[in-house]
Amino acid sequence: MSVHINAPEGAIAESVLLPGDPLRAKFIAENFLEDVVCYNEVRGMYGFTGTYKGKKISVQGTGMGIPSISIYANELIQSYGVKNLIRVGTCGGYSEKVKVRDLIIAMSASTDSNLNLVRFQGRTFAPTASFELLKPAYDIAVEKGFDPKVGSIYSSDVFYGDDDEDWKKWAKFGCLGVEMEAAALYTIAAKFGVNALALLTVSDHFVTGEVTSAEERQLTFTNMMEVALDTIAKIEN
């Protein structure tokens, strides 16, 4: 048991999917896992464990933003021994290379957060995905015909910014999209020597202005879920 996760020892698998939305965690558990047990409801942040293709897998909601995912990633790793963490979430598209509903595999994550400037005393750390997860995830996505886009993303502390043009700079430097968690997840995974990856579905687009509904974001976008689950099943064979 940890501060924010009310699960007994052994209740959480070594491999965990991390959707930001706890209702997406519930959707994944109900639609993809078998023999499901809900191990956490603290603060409404659902956590479930079940099996997928015979493999024990957990799904834990994290909430939005770097502080929130940092809490859950730290507790999952330190209190429950989790070894593989795959974020399954949404992002805003920055690049014309991606379209709404495309799957992005985040190779690295830039950020405007000060988390690593504080941690590394003003020096820069480059948060990157674990190749041990990235390679099988890419191969699986290609096999499924999902045409994944692999590249860097931007993890922002700000959802409602003051500069409407700021995103163009990040797009110019190759960022495919923006979300709010991956830089922290990759940093924490590196700190503890475990594996992490972010699989993101483009839910809206800064270039085209296209958006998706809250219901669609919660109940669809299943490609990234399938890739994440099959990646875990593959690495645990």
From Swiss-Prot:
Organism this protein belongs to: Clostridium beijerinckii (strain ATCC 51743 / NCIMB 8052)
Entry keyword annotation includes Transferase: yes
Function: Catalyzes the reversible phosphorolytic breakdown of the N-glycosidic bond in the beta-(deoxy)ribonucleoside molecules, with the formation of the corresponding free purine bases and pentose-1-phosphate.
Designated gene of the protein: deoD
Assembly: Homohexamer; trimer of homodimers.
EC number: 2.4.2.1
Reaction(s) the record says it catalyses: a purine D-ribonucleoside + phosphate = a purine nucleobase + alpha-D-ribose 1-phosphate; a purine 2'-deoxy-D-ribonucleoside + phosphate = a purine nucleobase + 2-deoxy-alpha-D-ribose 1-phosphate
Positions of the record's site feature: Important for catalytic activity: 217
Similarity section: Belongs to the PNP/UDP phosphorylase family.
Protein name: Purine nucleoside phosphorylase DeoD-type
Positions of phosphate binding: 20, 24, 43, 87-90
BP-aspect Gene Ontology terms: purine nucleoside catabolic process
Keywords in alphabetical order: Glycosyltransferase, Transferase
SUPFAM superfamilies: Purine and uridine phosphorylases
Amino-acid positions noted as binding a purine D-ribonucleoside in the UniProt annotation, renumbered to this chain: 4, 179-181, 203-204
CDD domains: PNP_EcPNPI-like
